[in-house]
Structure formats: C-alpha cells, structure tokens
Amino acid sequence: MAVDADSANYRIEHDTMGEVRVPAKALWRAQTQRAVENFPISGRGLERTQIRALGLLKGACAQVNSDLGLLAPEKADAIIAAAAEIADGQHDDQFPIDVFQTGSGTSSNMNTNEVIASIAAKGGVTLHPNDDVNMSQSSNDTFPTATHIAATEAAVAHLIPALQQLHDALAAKALDWHTVVKSGRTHLMDAVPVTLGQEFSGYARQIEAGIERVRACLPRLGELAIGGTAVGTGLNAPDDFGVRVVAVLVAQTGLSELRTAANSFEAQAARDGLVEASGALRTIAVSLTKIANDIRWMGSGPLTGLAEIQLPDLQPGSSIMPGKVNPVLPEAVTQVAAQVIGNDAAIAWGGANGAFELNVYIPMMARNILESFKLLTNVSRLFAQRCIAGLTANVEHLRRLAESSPSIVTPLNSAIGYEEAAAVAKQALKERKTIRQTVIDRGLIGDRLSIEDLDRRLDVLAMAKAEQLDSDRL
C-alpha cells in the first residue's frame, strides 16, 4: 500500500481556530505554523539573543509558578529543562517566524511555548502551551521583557567590553604618539600644529563617552514588564509574580541591572527605554564614523594622499589594479554605522507609534536594537584588533607637513601683528618658502622679534603643547 507523502511529511495540530498541517519533525505546533504561513516577508527571524532571553524567561516563570504552588513540580521541571535548552541555542531552528509579524510578538511567544511543550512531551511530560508554559503571563509582558533582557545583556556583557577594548587601543596610540607633531586641520584646511597623540586622545574620549552613554541608559533598559500581563494591571498573575521572576533572572544571568518596571503601564504601552538605548548606539555610530573617516584620510595615498599614517595591509584591494590595498576595516566601520543609524530611525518610529496600553512595533524594534548591539560589538573589536593596533605613523613626513603649513605663523601675531602675519603667510605660500625664511626676507627681524625668538615661536611641537596630554585621563 502506497504511503501518502503528506501524511509522512506532515502531522495535524489544532488550536482554537481549527486544524493546521505542521511539518512532521517540527517542535512547533499550530499557532506557530499559522504565523509562518501568514508572514513570509523578510526571511529574517528573531535575533539569537532574543531567543535565548525567551528561554531564560520561560524557565524563570515556571520556577516562580512552582514556588507559588500554581504549577506541579513535574511540569515546572520539564519547562525549566526545555527552556534551558532553548536558552543554550539547541533549538534555534525551531523559531521560523518572520520578524515582521504581529506587533506584540504573540506569534514568537507562542512559538516558544509550543516548542517547550513539544520538548517536554518527548520526555513524557504533557504540557499545554497556554495553560502551563504561559501560566501567569501574556505575550504583552513576556515579549517586551525578553527584549529588554536581551538588550541589557548585549550592552553589559558584550558592547561595553568591546568599546573598552577599542578605547584602550586608541588610548595606547595617543600615548605612543604624544610627541609626534603634525599639521592640525579645520574645515579640511591647514591649521596650527597638534600631535597625532592629541588627535587619538580625542578619539579615545569619544569612545569613553559612548560607554558612559550606554551605562547611563541601563536603569531604564533593565526595567522588565513581566507581571503586568495583558494591559499592565497584572490580571491573571500573582501580585508578586514579576518581582519574583526578576529575582530569578538576576540570579541566573548575573545582570544586576534587571529590575521590575517602575510602572507596568509604561512598561507595556511604551518602548522609551529601547528608544533611549538606541539613541546611545546611534551616537556611538556617529563617533565611529568620524574616527574611521579621519583614519582613512590620514592613511590615504600612498603617493597622492595625506600618507600621514599607514594602515595594516589586510587583503588585496582591487580585482583589476595589482598591488592596491584599501582601508577595508574603516569602510566596514562606516557601513555598520550607517546600518545602526538606520535601525535607530526605525526604532524611533516604532516607539512613537504605540497606542494606548500596548506598543505593537516590538518585534521590529527588538530585532533592530539587538542587531545594532551585535554589529557595534563585533566591529569595535575588529577595528581595535585589526586596524588601530597595527597603525604606524610616518613621523618625519608629519613634521614636514606641520612645518610647511602657513598657519604656523599664528604665534607671531603678538610680535608683528595679525595683518603682517597674514601677509607673511600669503607670501610664503605664493613663493613656496618657509614662514621663517619669509619673515627674514621681509626684514621683520629686529627690536620686536629676534632670530632666537622667531625660532622659539616657530617650534611646531611647542605650539602643540604636547605636555598637556594627561595620560591619567585616557
């Protein structure tokens, strides 16, 4: 007798809307399958970090429900074990729903509930996805809670250490080059001298400030909606459910930043904590763009650019021009920055469009902010390791450029006056002479300006005040 191909490859599941055909080996069930069929949009699912957070949360909720005598210990143990497998990444392929789905994340919450129930069933424990796994919860508090757990962990465990590594690499270069003098530039035009170390100290401070911004948003980012259930009133959950769940999560993750939401209505109706955190990430993206672009410009050449520094040669740069090497990592940094800024725009739009008791842009906002955390973390580490650490300075070339800049006439203002100094600069530029020689040619050495005073004033390293670089503040 021939075997029906459909019966071999699919099984029938049911929910409150009726029967659904589900792939035979899938751990998900009816509600997940409906969402798979309803939202074949981008081919992009939840971030791995959010799936992990959903697993952590479901396990914590089961523990609390058991502690309160609401859930049988056998069922609680089965949920906790299955949820741990999900958190560890053993079942990522069982989360097929597109990120562009119902705006509350209900589909992904039920996906989690169904997978946990199916894992438990393999161990001989029967669980209902709603009655047991989702006990004392709704999608409206679990999905935002998982989002904030994942974002907080991404910030504390991953992004901040990566930014610290980048800061340290930049600060090391600032110290190494604190006496390497170069021409300053404002408006992309020659300005008075600075040191390469001073420039890099500025970059290091930008990253340090970025770390401070991320840390500053953690008190709001770490607020969790769990316990508010559908609309923030806590209906169908014990009064202290959220507090207990958060305590379990803090113990499991070590994230002391996690806390019960100050106001459960705000925690479900608005996503301001995500918007704020994304704003910090956007600012970091802006900082990285500035730093990467400066480094690209300083490394431009090798013969027709600035050629002030040399970037590590990482890979051939052209499929047609032999020997060409490009600044590939700074280019990757600026592309990441563009993506993060775009993600932030979508997050802001999503945050602005919550309505009454629930924001319904959470899956998109979650995906975007978690992607931004991931991109910034990875590119910051690579930028530090494979670019900044290997930079070298063309010291003599830098000094020649500094000494040839007409702007070094500036310290002569107090001796010969602004207008005469401007005339010196213009003549030096026109005649391709040094400022020193032009001052002498114009007969300006005399009572107001001795040759010794001229040389002292034209010391480009002294102009840069390199001794003011405070290593303790890097």
Swiss-Prot record:
Location(s), subcellular: Cytoplasm
Enzymatic class: lyase
Tree of life domain: Bacteria
GO cellular component terms given for this protein: cytosol; extracellular region; peptidoglycan-based cell wall; plasma membrane
Biological process (GO), any one: fumarate metabolic process
Record's keyword annotation contains Disulfide bond: no
Record's keyword annotation contains Transmembrane: no
PROSITE patterns listed in its UniProt record: FUMARATE_LYASES
EC nos: 4.2.1.2
UniProt KW keywords: Acetylation, Cytoplasm, Lyase, Tricarboxylic acid cycle
Pathway(s) per entry: Carbohydrate metabolism; tricarboxylic acid cycle; (S)-malate from fumarate: step 1/1
Protein activity control: Competitively inhibited by N-(5-(azepan-1-ylsulfonyl)-2-methoxyphenyl)- 2-(4-oxo-3,4-dihydrophthalazin-1-yl)acetamide.
Entry's Gene Ontology molecular function annotations: fumarate hydratase activity
Record's catalysed reaction(s): (S)-malate = fumarate + H2O
Similarity-based family: Belongs to the class-II fumarase/aspartase family. Fumarase subfamily.
Other information: There are 2 substrate-binding sites: the catalytic A site, and the non-catalytic B site that may play a role in the transfer of substrate or product between the active site and the solvent. Alternatively, the B site may bind allosteric effectors.
Protein task: Involved in the TCA cycle. Catalyzes the stereospecific interconversion of fumarate to L-malate.
Name of the protein this chain belongs to: Fumarate hydratase class II
Species the sequence originates in: Mycobacterium tuberculosis (strain ATCC 25618 / H37Rv)
